[in-house]
Amino acid sequence: MLSDITSEFESRKPGIASFETFAAECMSEMNGDPANASLYLMLGLTARQFYDQFNGQPVTVAVAEEGKDRMLAVARAAEAALGEPADDKLSVLNEIALKNFQTG
């Protein structure tokens, strides 16, 4: 359940391992909640992107905390969209895509 995954992520230290775990948990949850699979996928990809960007590098506490705050905001928006009409879910998916995957 997304609220559990988000709460666990929030309670962890803001290091890259927390992002890796969050991503894996979201990807795993896709199978258990197919009606919301796209939300879990985008959250997982977003967390994985942070992990991939900083894996093997020193990360300042400020950068890690900023990333964690952004991830929590997106996860909470996705939580709010669960059980809502498809248009609400699509809005959250678009928000995640625009904030995290824009190029150029």
What are these regions (language model features)?
Residues 63-104:
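Amphipathic alpha-helical binding modules
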Residues 1-34, 91-103:
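Short terminal alpha-helical segments
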Residues 1-8, 50-53, 77:
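Solvent-exposed, amphipathic alpha-helical segments
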Residues 16-69:
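Amphipathic alpha-helical interaction modules
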